[in-house]
A protein has these predicted regions:
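Extended, subdomain-level signal for the structured scaffold at the beginning of enzyme domains
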Residues: 1-70
Length: 70
């Protein structure tokens, strides 16, 4: 099943990705995966720590409907 990829970066807004993840998961039944430049934990501007599912190098575009850049 294809998913939606969301690219995160240091000091991203957790609200931006949270709303997108909620929308796709509960309104369209599409799961999301978090992508980052490396596998290190990324800290949002609110101080929330997120461990990405995959790195940019592991991203395979055929596995996803799209890549969202918040």
């Amino acid at each position: 099943m294809k998913k939606i990829a969301i690219l995160i970066y240091p000091e991203f807004s957790i609200q931006e990705i949270g709303d997108i993840m909620y929308l796709f998961r509960w309104h369209y039944d599409i799961k999301t995966e978090i992508i980052a430049s490396n596998s290190d934990i990324v800290v949002s501007e609110e101080g929330v720590c997120i461990k990405p599912h995959k790195t940019v190098n592991e991203f395979v575009k055929e596995d996803y409907y799209c890549l969202i850049l918040p």
